[in-house]
Regions:
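ATP-binding/phosphotransfer module of carbohydrate and carboxylate kinases, centering on a glycine-rich
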Residues: 2-92, 139-145, 189-369
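Glycine-rich beta-strand-to-loop/alpha-helix junction loops that act as flexible
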Residues: 97-103, 151-153, 280-291
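Short acidic capping loops at alpha-helix termini that bridge into adjacent secondary structure
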Residues: 90-94, 125-126
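Membrane helical hairpin/interfacial module
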Residues: 78, 94, 101-105
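Phosphate-binding/catalytic loop of phosphoryl-transfer enzymes
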Residues: 103-203, 343-345, 351-353, 366
Length: 369
């Protein structure tokens, strides 16, 4: 569902050429996800990254949550290399924003250890620790009221009126992520297996694609169930569903149902109106929506029906762009996104700034994430 990652060497070489003429002070944006750690260096007064670097492999997660030591092992050398390539070796970093998948539930060690470690190693004066849904929001919408649906292997919707956050789904492939890549892929494989068995709701077209991708249908359980990356394997079949949707009604129906789930999540988190009574902005971000018209056409229809007051906007940037923009806003004292103890935390701010709330789609009362 995601684009191939560049090697650290090729990314670093490109960064040196791009960033040589830009002066500091500098900020760092960091995106830590399932496919690895990405780092962007930017100037406080700039808009685009000065340089970027991709680190190989994801940050480890253990019994204590996301491993702060392992994150630092990747982040610190990358940051120093980027500074060196910009002719600023030894310079301090004004602000850092780190967005991480699982930050809300698995980020306790990061919140405990990173503030002091980054200050000691890089002279970081200001730090923001955010969930990856928040950096996706910042990258797509910025610091305006609105809503973002981030779709890839999973699916999560996040919205804010700039006083609190609202979240819908993002509960993983066993409890939710309805309409996401793994959900679509699993539904497509279910239809294929139904066709193999002769049960109602089967799709011969999807059975043919299953056999082309995975081999004989009866062998699929033995291939799938031992895998530790089952959501990604399921999601890998989602493009096959999209490819069949133009001529197979079962595949088209799966994508219509996925679109309904995505629109439902967006509806749950979208503020009633933007600033000054403007329509709520809704952005779609992530690899899921690169499947094109088979998903986007029914999704636009569902969003228009459920959110007639909303305005669809193109996402202006990805989570790494969002992390860098949060770091810049933090450095200039202009971070307007609502704080939350686990969703967007700025260590050193008063407790009243960290006490923001998150509401879920089932409950309009504020609840902790």
């Amino acid at each position: 569902m995601s684009a191939p990652r560049r090697s650290p060497e090729s990314t670093a070489a490109r960064a040196g050429a791009e960033g040589a003429a830009v002066s500091g002070p500098y900020v760092l944006g960091v995106d830590s996800g399932g496919s690895g750690l990405r780092v962007a260096l930017g100037a406080v007064g700039g808009s685009a990254p000065v340089a970027t670097r991709d680190c190989e492999g994801p940050v480890r997660t253990g019994p204590a949550g996301i491993d702060a030591g392992h994150l630092l092992e990747q982040l610190l050398p990358a940051a120093r290399l980027l500074l060196e390539q910009c002719g600023a070796a030894g310079s301090g970093i004004e602000a850092v924003a780190i967005g991480a998948a699982g930050m809300a539930t698995l980020g306790g060690q990061l919140r405990a250890e990173l503030p002091a470690a980054l200050e000691d190693a890089l002279g970081v004066r200001r730090l923001a620790l955010a969930g990856d849904a928040v950096t996706a929001y910042a990258g797509a919408v910025g610091q305006r009221p609105g809503a973002v649906v981030a779709g890839g292997t999973g699916m999560i919707a996040l919205g804010t009126d700039l006083t609190s956050w609202r979240r819908a789904d993002g509960w993983g492939h066993l409890l939710g992520d309805s309409g996401g890549g793994a959900w679509i892929g699993r539904a497509g494989l279910d239809a294929a297996m139904r066709a193999h068995d002769g049960r109602r709701g089967g799709s011969a077209a999807l059975l043919s694609r299953l056999e082309a991708v995975f081999g004989p249908a009866p062998e699929l359980p033995g291939l799938l169930y031992p895998r530790t990356d089952r959501p990604a394997v399921l999601a890998s079949f989602a493009p096959e569903v999209a490819a069949c949707a133009g001529h197979d009604p079962v595949a088209a129906g799966i994508l219509r149902e996925a679109a309904a789930h995505v629109a439902e999540a967006a509806e749950a988190v979208c503020p009633a109106a933007g600033r000054d009574g403007e329509p709520c902005e809704v952005a779609l971000t992530g690899g899921l929506f690169r499947m094109g018209d088979p998903l986007l056409v029914p999704l636009r229809e569902e969003l228009s029906r459920r959110l007639p007051q909303a305005r669809m906007v193109p996402g202006s940037g990805d989570p790494l762009t969002g992390a860098l923009s949060i770091a810049r806003a933090l450095a200039t004292g202009d971070l307007r996104l609502p704080r939350h103890p686990t969703l967007l935390r700025v260590p050193g701010e008063g407790p009243e700034r960290q006490s923001g709330q998150v509401a879920t789609e089932q409950d309009s009362r504020p609840v902790s994430l």
